[in-house]
Amino acid sequence: AGQLNDLGSAIGNAVEERLKSERFKAELITNVSHDLKTPLTSIINYVDLLKKTGVEDPKALEYIEVLDRKSQRLKKLTEDLVEASKASTGALTVNKERLGFIQLLDQALGEYEEKFEKSGLSPVCTAPDHELYVEADGRHLWRVIDNLLGNCVKYAMPGTRVYLDVKAWDGNVVLSVKNVSREPLNIPADRLMERFVRGEESRTTEGSGLGLSIARSLTELQGGTFRLDIDGDLFKAVVSFPECRALTAAPPL
């Protein structure tokens, strides 16, 4: 019995130390990102001013465009770092409400229409002709969908279709997103959900390797499940949330 108690105590201490380590990393990332925010905002503002000064020199315009793109990428990276850190430690506030899942997905697809077109991708969406409701945080759920679509834009093979399927299944609303990867996926699916891990080793596309990790953490934070499947160069993400049944009218008094 004494050995079991000692073992239980050791495990408890190890878990506590791990939690402290995670909290420390979260605080460090948040503080560093905050320190970067002020100078980065100044750089972005000065770049905007340069764009409005009527510069005509082609080389100077090229430099300004590079500055703009890189500073915006750094801004997105710092935001992703903070969100990934908070989501993984459960330090984000979750305000659940009844949401129309199909409506939210339609809005996201509308915003991504131009991005899909530029990437040579054709989205094919299959969904019921009636709304499916979930109880979730609207901002976090939007980020999950946004990250999944953004992942397609970055890594799907141009000239292919992206298949999105929404259905009610076994008390859940399930979204699956399938695409063909532009690069071989020589990596286990679980590894793709880790922070800073990307499926393509050449790193020819701009990305932080945080998108899928954030999507999984935010999904689980809201009581959902997140799964990845890889078969050759076929990538599939499956997100599931408990279905929230339609409200019924109150009986007359």
Regions found by a protein language model. Give the residues of each.
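Conserved micro-motifs of the catalytic ATP-binding
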Residues: T89-V94, Y133-A136
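Short conserved segment of the HATPase_c
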Residues: D129, P184-V197
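Conserved glycine-rich
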Residues: G223-G224
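Conserved catalytic submotifs in the C-terminal HATPase_c
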Residues: N95-L99, E117, S122-L132
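Short helix-loop "hinge" at the ATP-lid/N-box region of the Bergerat-fold HATPase_c
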Residues: C152-V153
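Short beta-strand/loop element within the Bergerat-fold HATPase_c
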Residues: G159-G171
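A conserved beta-strand-to-alpha-helix junction within the catalytic ATP-binding
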Residues: N95-L109
